[in-house]
Structure formats: structure tokens, C-alpha cells
Regions:
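Bacterial N-terminal signal peptides that target proteins for export
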Residues: 1-9
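C-terminal motif of bacterial Sec signal peptides marking the signal peptidase cleavage site
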Residues: 16-19
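Ser/Thr-rich, low-complexity intrinsically disordered terminal regions
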Residues: 21-148
Length: 148
């Protein structure tokens, strides 16, 4: 009887420890897909302007892909320190612009956000803050295109 009780206790202990071994769940990807009644070139130009105004450096290729570097949090030489060690969040954007026809464009925009708890924490995928979210970037793009 004693071995049975100790076996059950060991099983419960191992189950409890295994349940605590995993990290926090990964956040869902911050992705939005929209169809805009605007030509593709106009969407690319407006999206580049919106992202540049938001503090991103924008790169475009001929295939319709728009990517950014990490968002500039402050306009000073200390911005690199924020992205490297002292900040608590950093964001970048990837977008795919596909022309449907002459006057309609499909846009897929994804925002990647990494965060940490403090100076000595490590960067992990995190939920995107609302000002940098994909939904807000789409809203700003629609404002720039005068669709709202």
C-alpha cells in the first residue's frame, strides 16, 4: 500500500512540474488582409509613406513585397540602445501588395512585435501594441488613400 501511495504522489509531482515547464503561449500573428479599390502603385506609395511616418525604414522589391526594419522609437543616437537592451518592445512590418485588376488591389499586412519584461530579459514574440497593430496600420493607409 505504501508503494502505491508513493507512486501516486510521484506521478502527481511529475505532472505538476511538467505543466509548469512550458513557456507562455505564443501570441496569434497580427495579420490583416484587405482588398482596396485603388491601383497597386498607389497602394505601395501610400503604404511606404504611412510606414515611413510611423518610424520604419521601408524596402520595396519588384514582386510587390514591402518590408521594414525595426521601428525607430526615438529620433536620437540612443535609439539603437532601446532596440538592443533598454527598450521593452520592437516592431517590424511585412506587406504583400498584389494587383487584382487595374483598379483593385489585395494587401496582406503582418506586424511582428517582440517584447521583454525588463533590461535583463530576453526578447520574445509578444502581442502587438494597438498603435503599431496591423489594424491601425490599415486604418492609417485607408486615411492616406482617402477611403474612410
Amino acid at each position: 500500500m505504501r508503494t502505491r501511495v508513493s507512486g501516486i504522489a510521484a506521478f502527481v509531482l511529475v505532472s505538476a512540474l511538467a505543466g509548469c515547464a512550458g513557456g507562455p503561449p505564443a501570441p496569434e500573428p497580427d495579420v490583416m488582409e484587405v482588398i482596396l479599390p485603388v491601383p497597386a502603385e498607389q497602394v505601395k506609395t501610400a503604404l511606404s509613406d504611412v510606414l515611413t511616418q510611423g518610424g520604419y525604414t521601408v524596402d520595396q522589391d519588384d514582386a510587390g513585397d514591402i518590408t521594414t526594419g525595426m521601428r525607430q522609437e526615438i529620433r536620437s543616437p540612443w535609439n539603437g540602445l532601446l532596440r538592443w537592451r533598454f527598450g521593452v518592445g520592437k516592431t517590424r512590418v511585412e506587406a504583400r501588395v498584389v494587383p487584382q485588376d487595374d483598379s483593385t488591389t489585395r494587401l496582406r499586412l503582418q506586424v511582428f512585435h517582440r517584447g521583454k519584461d525588463g533590461i535583463f530579459g530576453s526578447w520574445e514574440d509578444a502581442e502587438t501594441p494597438l498603435p503599431q497593430s496591423a489594424a491601425n496600420e490599415i486604418r492609417l493607409l485607408k486615411n492616406a488613400l482617402r477611403l474612410l
